[in-house]
Amino acid sequence: MERKSQVSDTNNNSIPTNVLLKFVGFSVALFTLPLITYFWTLKTLFKGYQTLYAGLSAAVMVNIILALYIVAAFREDSGTPKKDIKRE
């Protein structure tokens, strides 16, 4: 009976909560912020070539969010301890 609990603990492949929250947060940002940027710049900033510049600003926003996600992913701790290998 004890052995089953030990096996289930080692086979626990659940995703940490902070990783899921980060993923959901960036997913929501990736969906909403470019739309908000597009419509805000369309109505307030650009005159003349409104849709072109508003679309470009939304595309820039997507690239910013993706870059931030990549930086956050690289900075995240993998959770595996690093072993020091000493050669003698």
Swiss-Prot record:
Residues 1-18, 75-88 are cytoplasmic. It is found in: Endoplasmic reticulum membrane; Endoplasmic reticulum-Golgi intermediate compartment membrane; Cytoplasmic vesicle, COPII-coated vesicle membrane. The chain crosses the membrane at residues 19-39, 54-74. It is a multi-pass membrane protein. InterPro entries: Vma21. Keywords: Cytoplasmic vesicle, Endoplasmic reticulum, Membrane, Transmembrane, Transmembrane helix. Residues 40-53 are lumenal. It holds the Pfam family VMA21. HAMAP family: VMA21 (MF_03058). This is Vacuolar ATPase assembly integral membrane protein vma21. It comes from Schizosaccharomyces pombe (strain 972 / ATCC 24843).
